[in-house]
Amino acid sequence: MSDATVAKKPRETDDVPVPPTLRKSLKNRHIQLIALGGAIGTGLFYGSSESIQLAGPAILLAYLIGGLAIFLIVRALSEMAVEDPKAGAFSYYATQYWSKRAGFISGWNYWFNYVLVAMVELAVVGSFVNYWFPNIPKWVSAVVFLVAIAALNLMGVNKFGEFEFWFAIIKIVAVLAMIFGGLYVIIANVPTASGIRASFANWFTVDGGFLPHGLMSSNADGTWTGLLMALVVVMFSFGGTELIGITAGETENPRTTIPKATNGIIWRILVFYICALGVIMAVIPWSTIDGNSSPFVQIFDSVGVHAAAGILNFVCLTAVMSVYNSGLYANSRMLYSLAKQGNAPAYLGRLNKRGVPVGGVITSAIIIAIAVVVVFVWPDFAFNYLMSIATIAAAINWIMIMITEIKFRRVVAAGDGPNDLKGLKGQEALDKLAFKLPFAKVTPYVVIAFMLLVVVLMCFSASYRIAVVAGVIWLVVLFAAYQITQKRA
């Protein structure tokens, strides 16, 4: 082959330097496991006790309803991501198909949400380390993990993907081991600590049956329980599932990988939440699960694995590192996207030779470090108020994704869709969408109504009521911040 037939690749030494770009280094196995592990966190291993107490065995129905809602949210996001894969995902889409203000609010809201989530995860990492090394100060553990994960994210997206892959494997193995251990207790009729025979019939026969608190019921202390109240806890246990959309801009083949990962969400929820909690409540009477110890530990104890507490501690430490790793990745890409849209300082949009937005990684890590200091100095303030904003921020994100999906389809139908869709109009354009949202004419409105119902239900709980008020204030702050930045522009 002659030199004339070979296209010369531009190099940095040529007259026109090649600017660095985001690397499409995330493979199918990375995306599948990131999606798989994203829905499994400390909330499943420890927080499931709270949701079980709210609804009893009916919590399974709550997870099914909430799981369907989150599946449709990610399907909407993935419809856009497959056609127009970009870093920052829904912030970019909100800017492109809705308005620059919407992109600003969506992006900064998501970034701050993950800063707060990462803050709390790092604040508790010391508790897990102290299980084995009680003399190590908790702040030392937080600093070590903060620096280590930040360094990992600076190495390149492939390193992030590889670590998330193995973090997810550890969590998945732990859940599957619990499920099979519980099934062994049921099938082999192993004696339980409660004296009640392990059986799936316990869902319907123990302490009030399947729906012990009804849809909603008020308690003597003024608190509310029931299936509807459990939906609040359930929905926010799915936080982070939308990370699939963020990864689209760095995925090798988003048109095949993203749909596979998205369609698997419903099965992951069925296996890792509904099956896991169903087995737990078949072995342990739901009314005895009080949060003093993880129900996972109780299952392992039942099959003779008395080192379960130590094993679960390791799994939870892994889950915490995974959340911070994912959070730092998502935040750096969101800041990169905001900078490219003109909604953040320009330095956040620069990449190093590995295709990493260094400014976004370092800036996010520094802000998270400051937030961790706040947690240690004013723990009550941090957990009661800052995390309230994180809670409502997730609801804001999901509602904005669905509104953006409505706007996206209108733009596509008008002939201004991205890439191959440009120029096509009406139903012809919509039919060309590669990964369509099911029942797209009504689905976004149904999901938005459902999320608004969840926000209303939050008002019935004293702790979540703070979140609703904080969320309104937070939106006002974002609106004001956008107006200020536009006047300075």
Q: What would you call each of these model-derived segments?
A:
Residues 1-48, 53-55, 71-75, 86-87, ...:
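Membrane-interface "cap" regions at the ends of multi-pass membrane proteins
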Residues 4, 15, 92-95, 101, ...:
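Helix-loop-helix connectors at the membrane interface of multi-pass transporters/channels
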Residues 22-23, 46-141, 145, 265-268, ...:
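Extracellular loop-to-transmembrane helix junctions
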Residues 86, 109-124, 233-251, 309-346, ...:
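Membrane-helix boundary/coupling elements in multi-pass transport proteins
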Residues 92-94, 99, 131, 205-219, ...:
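TM-loop-TM module centered on a large, flexible mid-protein loop between adjacent transmembrane helices
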Residues 166-167, 347-358, 398-463, 488:
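C-terminal membrane-solvent junction of multi-pass transporters and transport-like membrane proteins
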Residues 172-213, 279-284, 401-416, 462, ...:
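Hydrophobic alpha-helical segments and their helix-loop junctions in multi-pass secondary transporters
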Residues 185-186, 382-397, 437-489:
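A generic transmembrane alpha-helix motif of multi-pass inner-membrane proteins
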